[in-house]
């Protein structure tokens, strides 16, 4: 991973990361990181390198990658999931879903189908959509995918900015980001969300 990061820098390309997730969308339910220490060590080093850059977007990516470490180690989401409120997923059949990370073994529901209504607002503002959002608020998965994390990082930027500033200053002063110190932000999230 770190070699790819350096290659992307040399090519002046952006570098994005992800971890295994299980869901109906991926047609996979048995993904598991088995070499947790090695993978988290690589993410740790990536975070250190991202925080050395002079680009605030890289610092935000460092925060996202800290969330990946937390996810891989089985922790709760650092920020709430607001899938179905801040974003949605449209499948090829017209189903409007809160996200593409749902598992039938956990829960699976649609907000509605575009083929059955006159316009999107009928789905987005429906009672069914409200029911699905309540399920999201109690979802046990603790996913950490860019599609659901990026919107809440932007929404709660004033909450995560102190972490970014503190750790940028640490790196400037020659220290490392402590990736064992995982921040959690309570911004109205349901206490049941992310309890695996």
Predicted stretch roles:
Residues 1-83, 87, 91-92, 96-97, ...:
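Radical SAM enzyme [4Fe-4S]-AdoMet core and its adjacent flexible, acidic
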Residues 95-96, 100-196:
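Flexible mid-to-C-terminal extensions adjoining Fe-S/redox cofactors in radical SAM and related proteins
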